[in-house]
Amino acid sequence: MRVEIDHRNSGGGKLRHPEKQHRPDNPIQRKPAWIRVKAPNHPVYHETRALMREAKLVTVCEEAACPNIGECWSQRHATMMIMGEICTRACAFCNVTTGQPAPLAADEPARVAEAVARLGLQHVVITSVDRDDLDDGGAAHFAAVIGAIRAAAPSTTIEILTPDFLRKPGALEVVVAARPDVFNHNLETVPRLYPSIRPGARYYQSLRLLDRVKQLDPSIFTKSGLMAGLGEDRGEVGQVMDDLRIADVDFLTIGQYLQPTVKHAAVDRFVTPDEFADLAAMARAKGFLMVSATPLTRSSYHADADFAALREARAARHAA
């Protein structure tokens, strides 16, 4: 069975992506066998889902219609999305709702921390929508969430996946000062495709953000991700890898882009598992500490095991 994507908001019947309704339809291609997944039905999946509902937390697993939700939630792994479920950007690839966000919930850091403690997570991934409406882009809220998790679950390692904080001076410094264990910011695609795929962002702003994290605190692991199958070529991907290595990024993820609705960017092609293996080999040769490149790779997929391997890889490199 395939996981079906909810294209509408629950209740009210409003379109989830009204800003995309003027765009022509892009038919959704049938997925090849190597990226089809079973519908989630494990008892622990339902327990995790119930806990998220009870704590009134949003997850990127649901909002972005992640194909790995069944596997991850069955292991009590969920990526929590803070600062609401409404994003101020309208990226052509993303299934998160676009619109005017609600004010920040002051109790959200405590609710996130409680959920992390109850799930007994060794490693947690926290992401967010873009909040261009806030003076600091939500930086102080990120810091508050990190602090609350440290207090409630001191042994849990924390990975954050942040927006670009475009035109938010001082915001990055606030987040880095909270000392997450991993700072992830996805470049998403190659520079040539930014105008059509990520129009609200700037490639070199994202690259500078990652570079600046390492300048501020070299002990923090940095991570970035790319989508494959949007029309990029191998040479362009190699150049992005080089840019990331110049910025001293430790961990690269590459996964297949999957089109959420007919109003989103079309899949240019489905990249084969062998091609992903080739990209992984190329990335390792360029010096990344860790690489995950498979059709179903997503930013937080297997993040707990990957973090343990990342620490071991750094220790081995320093010992060499």
Swiss-Prot record:
Entries under Pfam families matching the protein: Radical_SAM
Cofactor comment text: Binds 2 [4Fe-4S] clusters per subunit. One cluster is coordinated with 3 cysteines and an exchangeable S-adenosyl-L-methionine.
Pathway listed: Protein modification; protein lipoylation via endogenous pathway; protein N(6)-(lipoyl)lysine from octanoyl-[acyl-carrier-protein]: step 2/2
Main localization, broad class: cytoplasm
GO MF annotations in UniProt: 4 iron, 4 sulfur cluster binding; lipoate synthase activity; metal ion binding
Residues of the Radical SAM core domain: 73-289
Catalytic activity: [[Fe-S] cluster scaffold protein carrying a second [4Fe-4S](2+) cluster] + N(6)-octanoyl-L-lysyl-[protein] + 2 oxidized [2Fe-2S]-[ferredoxin] + 2 S-adenosyl-L-methionine + 4 H(+) = [[Fe-S] cluster scaffold protein] + N(6)-[(R)-dihydrolipoyl]-L-lysyl-[protein] + 4 Fe(3+) + 2 hydrogen sulfide + 2 5'-deoxyadenosine + 2 L-methionine + 2 reduced [2Fe-2S]-[ferredoxin]
Binding positions for [4Fe-4S] cluster 1 per the UniProt entry: C61, C66, C72, S300
Keywords: 4Fe-4S, Cytoplasm, Iron, Iron-sulfur, Metal-binding, S-adenosyl-L-methionine, Transferase
Entry binding sites for [4Fe-4S] cluster 2: C87, C91, C94
Subcellular location: Cytoplasm
Disordered, as annotated region: 1-27
Essential cofactor(s): [4Fe-4S] cluster
Alphabetized InterPro entries for the sequence: Aldolase_TIM, Elp3/MiaA/NifB-like_rSAM, Lipoyl_synth, rSAM
Biased composition (Basic and acidic residues): 16-25
EC number(s) per entry: 2.8.1.8
Highest taxon listed in the record's lineage: Bacteria
GO CC terms in record: cytoplasm
Family from the record: Belongs to the radical SAM superfamily. Lipoyl synthase family.
Protein known as: Lipoyl synthase
